[in-house]
C-alpha cells in the first residue's frame, strides 16, 4: 500500500501561517487555480482602527488639500504624533489586550478633561480692575422756551404817568363783588341776583321773556327798567300796574343803586392798578442793587 502523496511539496514553517481563501465546495474550478500566499507572522498586521478623538484628542484631523481637477492626486500629510500617543499594532497580540485598551482609554479621557477644563479663577487676571467709582454728574435740563425777559421787566413794568400805579391788564381790571354758584352749579348767588329775587323783578323778567318778540326779548328781559330800546312805554306801564299788586317792585331801583355803590367801593379797595383814564404809560426800569424804580423820560 503506497503512502499518500502530500498536496503541497512546500515545507511548513512553524513560524508562518498559511492564509488562503475559504473554498466552497460548489466553487468553480477556475477559482482553485490561484496560488497560495504564505506570510510570516511578523509581517501580519492587525485590523485595529484608531480613533484620533480618543487616542489623541489634542491633534485635530487634518484635512487634505483639495486636488485640482485633472491634476495628479496628492498625498495628505500624516499628522505628527508623539511617542507617548503611538499605539502599536502588536499590543493587541499580547497577553493583556483588555488592560492595555482600558488604560489607553482612561489616559485619553483624562487628557480630554484636562484640555476642556477652564483655568482656575485665581489665575484669571482681569484686564483692568475698577477701583474708583464714577462721579455722578448732575445735568441741568435744557430750557426750550428761549430767552425770557428779566424778572424786573416780566410784568408790572408799565406805570401810569399820573398816579404811578401799574397799568397791566391784571392790575387795572375792575374787581367785582364776590359771587358763587349754588344748587349743583345751577343758580348764581350774587348781590344783584339777591336784589332781583327779593324785589320780585325775576317775575317781571320772565313775563317779558315770554311775551315780547324774538328780536326784543333779550333786551327787555335783561334790562326791564332801561329807558332805551323798544317798547319802553309799554314796559314801564306794565311794571307800574304790577307794582300795585307787588309793592316790592318799588324797592328794585333803590336796591340796585346800593349794589352799584358797593361795587365801586369794593373796586377802589381791592384794585391795585391804575384807575385813571386817558393817561400816558412809562416803562419802569429797576436800578441795579436797589429796589426802587426809576421812570424813563419817554412816555408812550
UniProtKB/Swiss-Prot annotation:
Keywords: Acetylation, Cell membrane, Cell projection, Cytoplasm, Developmental protein, Membrane, Phosphoprotein
UniProt-listed InterPro entries: Sprouty, Sprouty_domain
Entry GO terms, CC: cytoplasm; ruffle membrane
In-chain residues carrying the UniProt-annotated modification Phosphoserine: 126
Tissue: Expressed in the embryo and adult tissues including heart, brain, lung, kidney, and skeletal muscle.
SPR domain span: 167-274
Xref: Pfam families: Sprouty
Induction description: By FGF signaling.
Membrane-protein topology: Peripheral membrane protein
Residue ranges, compositional bias (Low complexity): 7-21, 92-108
GO BP terms in the entry: cellular response to leukemia inhibitory factor; negative regulation of substrate adhesion-dependent cell spreading; regulation of signal transduction
UniProt GO MF annotations: protein kinase inhibitor activity
Family assignment from sequence similarity: Belongs to the sprouty family.
Domain notes: The Cys-rich domain is responsible for the localization of the protein to the membrane ruffles.
Subunit and interaction comment: Interacts (via C-terminus) with TESK1 (via both C- and N-termini); the interaction inhibits TESK1 kinase activity. Interacts with RAF1. Interacts with CAV1 (via C-terminus).
Protein name (Swiss-Prot/TrEMBL): Protein sprouty homolog 4
Organism: Mus musculus (Mouse)
Record gene name: Spry4
